Amino acid sequence: MIIRKRIWPRTLSDFFSMTFILTIIPIIYWFQLWVVLPAIHEHGSLPYILHFLFGNFIMLNIVGNFTYIIFCDTSTRRDIMPISAANTKDGWRLCASCETLAPPRSWHCPTCNICILKRDHHCIFTGCCIGHYNHRYFIMFLLYLFVATTYSFCYNNLFIWNRMQFEFPMSFIKIIFPLAIFIFGFDGTTNQFYLILYIVSAVGMLYTGVLCIYHFCLVLNGNIANESNKKIHIYNLGWKQNVKEVLGNRWYLTWTLPYIKSQLPHNDKLYKFKKILQ
């Protein structure tokens, strides 16, 4: 893996989004394993140990995949080819912004200011583009975020509803609009803080769930976002091969840990086309 030269966000939106992720994930992790879990299961019991280990397994995958996403260089910086050697029939084209030839399925990112190999999109939460080399880690990062927020939401239901006393209509307002405390009076209790984390996990579950459906459909259909928007489907090789194109030849193991090596079935400049019957 080639390391990116610059890993810090380039725009304010990227900076604040990435800062939010780097802040909220450790807070939720602490809340679930050191506040919620001991309140539901007795410390040292078998359910407590199993849930504690599972929570750390999820956290390891979230942090590991996030790290690989931001450090992995998936740009065309090392793929310079002389104009005479490139073939437009293979998908090579001239990028006016980079003033060089761009490989097939690569697109220029105005934020990263370079062409990205098999560019899917620019992710504001990681401050970089998702492309050929880090697509696998993005998919797994998204999957484990959804698992984590769903897992948190289910346990938070038991924790919040057993802990808080509800009074209509203020309790209803606090649940639906937790920031309304700044209008109706600041509530500095720990219950209000826990309630905000409960809302964050619920919103996170819905948000990552929608993203999982969208991006998993792209992977299964052999598409990236730009191609899907333009109705380009010539890279659809069947669901299994499409999955290998993103997760690698050992695709069935990539969900376990981000450190598992899984070689991609082709290089970064040549992609198989689906045979189209005339």
Predicted regions and their residues:
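Membrane-associated feature with strongest affinity for ZDHHC
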Residues: 1-278
